[in-house]
Amino acid sequence: MATRIPFDESYWEEYLSGQEASLPALPAVTQLSPRVTRLLAGNPGIMQLQGTNTYLVGTGPARILIDTGEGRPVWHATLAEHLRTHHLTLEYILLTHWHGDHTGGIPDLIAHDPTLQSRIYKHHPDRGQRPIRDGQRFTVTGATVRAVFTPGHAIDHMCFLIEEEKALLTGDNVLGHGFAIVQDLAEYMASLARMAALGCERGYPAHGAVIENLPAKMQLYIHHNEVRVQQVITALASVVKLPGKRVGMTVPEIGRAIYGEVPREIVENAIVPFLSQVLWKLAEDRKVGFEPGEANKRRWFGLVTQQ
C-alpha cells in the first residue's frame, strides 16, 4: 500500500474558498428521483462544497439512509421533520466511510431512537455497528442497494449502487464539482476503474450536484490521474544517463521538471505531497525505483523506457 501523504488544507484555503463561492446553490431537501431524496447536512465549507449530501433511498415507508453529515442540529431537525411528515422510518443506515462529515450525525440519531444503533453499517464498523461486505445488498420497498468496496479516498470507502436506477452513490471518490482528495493513489485509481466498469449512468455524490453523465465524469477523473502519472514517468525518463551510474531525481526536481520554477510554498504544500503519492504508486507498479534517504532528498529513477 502506498504511503499516505497529508493534505495541507490551510495552504489552499483562499483558492478553495473561491471555488466554494462559485458553486450552484442546492436546496436543503430535494427529490432527485422516484426513489432518491437528498438532504443537505448543513455544513458548507471549503472541503465540503455545498455541504455533505445525505440520501434517503426507497419508495415505501422504510428507507435506507446514506451517511449522516457531521452532526449539525439543522440536519437532524430536517431529517426528523421529513421522516415525520412522510411517515417514514429508517431500515438501514449505510456509511460511505469514516470521515467525520459523514458519520458525525450518528449520536443524534441514536439519541432520538436507540434502536437505530443496530442498523448502522460501515466497512470498518465502530463498536455497536455492523460490517459492510463488498457486494452486500440492502433491500427496502422500491430499492435494492449494493455495496461496492472502493478504497482510495479513505481506507474503508464504499460506494452504493442502486440497482433499479443503474445509479451510483459515489461517496467522496467522485464529486459533483472538482476533484477528490486522495489518501492512497494506487487504490484510488483501481477503484475508479472498478466504478467505471459498473456501467452506471447517474451519480449521486457525497458533495456537490447530481452527476447526470457519470460515464463522462468517470473518464474525466481517470484521465486526470493518468496524465499526472505519465508526467512523472516522462520527467524521470528525461534524466541524462551516465555510463555505469544510476541517476535519479528528487521530488522537488521532478516538480520543477513538470511545473517549472514555482514558489517554494507551492512546492512544499502541494506539489511534493501529490508527486509523492504518484511515485509510491509507480513504485508499487515497479515502474520506478528509489535510493534510500530523507523524503525530499531521496532520488527516484525510472524502470521503464519511454516509447
Curated annotation (Swiss-Prot):
One of its GO terms (biological process) is viridicatumtoxin biosynthetic process. Belongs to the metallo-beta-lactamase superfamily. Zn(2+) 1 binds at H97, H99. CDD domains: LACTB2-like_MBL-fold (cd07722). Pfam families: Lactamase_B. Gene3D superfamilies: Ribonuclease Z/Hydroxyacylglutathione hydrolase-like, Winged helix-like DNA-binding domain superfamily/Winged helix DNA-binding domain. This is Lactamase-like protein vrtG. Keywords: Hydrolase, Metal-binding, Zinc. It comes from Penicillium aethiopicum. Its cofactor is Zn(2+). The active site is at D101 (proton donor/acceptor). Zn(2+) 2 binds at D101, H102. Lactamase-like protein; part of the gene cluster that mediates the biosynthesis of viridicatumtoxin, a tetracycline-like fungal meroterpenoid with a unique, fused spirobicyclic ring system. The first step of the pathway is the production of the malonamoyl-CoA starter unit for the polyketide synthase vrtA. The aldolase vrtJ may be involved in the synthesis of the malonamate substrate for malonamoyl-CoA synthetase vrtB. The polyketide synthase vrtA then may utilize the malonamoyl-CoA starter unit, followed by sequential condensation of eight malonyl-CoA units to form the polyketide backbone. Its EC number is 3.1.-.-. Signal peptide: none annotated. Pathway: Secondary metabolite biosynthesis; terpenoid biosynthesis. One of its GO terms (molecular function) is hydrolase activity. Binds 2 Zn(2+) ions per subunit. Viridicatumtoxin and its derivative, viridicatumtoxin B, exhibit anti-methicillin-resistant Staphylococcus aureus (anti-MRSA) activity. Moreover, viridicatumtoxin and a C2 acetyl analog, spirohexaline, have been demonstrated to inhibit bacterial undecaprenyl diphosphate synthase, a potential new target for antibiotic development.
